[in-house]
Amino acid sequence: MHNTLNKIQFILFPLLVLILISPNVLANKLSCNTNNIDKFIGAENIKSIDISTVKSKKWVKNYLNAYKEPNKIILEKYKKKFLANISIRFNNDLECIFPSKIRINGDYKDHLESTPPIASLDVELLAGNINSTIKFKLFIPHTRGGENEVFATALLKELKFLAPKTLIVPATFNDIKTTFIFQEKITKEFIESNHLREAPILEGDERFRWNIDPNERALGLNPFTLARITNNKWIEKGYTSLNISKDALEQLNKAYLNYSSYQHFSNSNGENLLNLKLSDFINENYIKKEREFKAILIAIGSSHGLIPHNRSFYYDPIYRTFNSIYYDGDSTVVNLKSSNRKLDFIKFGSYLNNDEIIGSSYAIESLNKLNQKIFHKKLLDLGLKFSLE
């Protein structure tokens, strides 16, 4: 009883303080503390983020309703958007205020488990951009494995795989100090920043996965899991983009259906993940890169990102291939421990298949070429405090 009372007081006290605060006014445009163009060019790294909701009372009410819900899952009705002013300070002391929309982000209630009313956030800037990023997530660190997620994305980017910009950043939310993991969303801007032409972005469709047995869900075994295209506006550009999108979705859903029907378990090649070798145009370099991607994710404890409903892809319409995008790997690399539970969905027996063995050799080759000093400097810029010693 005493513990329950303390928990209620812990949640309600900061919320009551917020309710007494006067509502803010949304900034009507991007504003910065300088017009010096050199400052904008040199603003590479985020130093801190300050978020102020325009209607604090409504945010608190929505947060409390989501928190009180007996369901472990955060229901969609609590993911409504709120206006907010986001002030970002960069490493060169440039500071800008962005009018924005924010909402609660995440599937489960661990995304609400911080100092109330702080939650993991989905953010869209209504004016301006942060190094070409307009849409991004601000995760409560423990929901993404803290330093593990930052290290994993940095490593994959350094090895020339597609992975979102991710960093640890000090923050305040309605004057409450906190820390977030900043991670850009997989959007048009993400594709362009990786020097790729705009084309379909696909991901595992999770809309039906909540209606299955929890044990099957944990293993990624969902007969209803298919893929979907996330950049729908690109489809509407014309017949060419529509036909490319249809081709991409048809090919990828073939792989998802094969996986869901367990056909991949009996394939002669021993493939026990999504089989993406679907096109006649696939070359050896693509196969090598995909094998290496899988091997690295397994090695750094990020096999969660290989479960079909967690996967994201960029479709290359010229070669008709699916380039894997790292997302939500739930890595354990920093803690130097592995979870056998995480591997359950891909390990059927005590053997490694050909792809895993060959992919491991490719991964070792790439890691041996890594410039440790340059990579270490990048990790420090992302908010990690690692030593080379």
List each language-model region with its residue ranges.
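Regulatory N- and C-terminal appendages and interdomain linkers associated
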Residues: 23-97, 318-322, 385-389
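Conserved ATP-binding subdomain of kinase catalytic cores across diverse folds
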Residues: 89-230, 299-302, 318
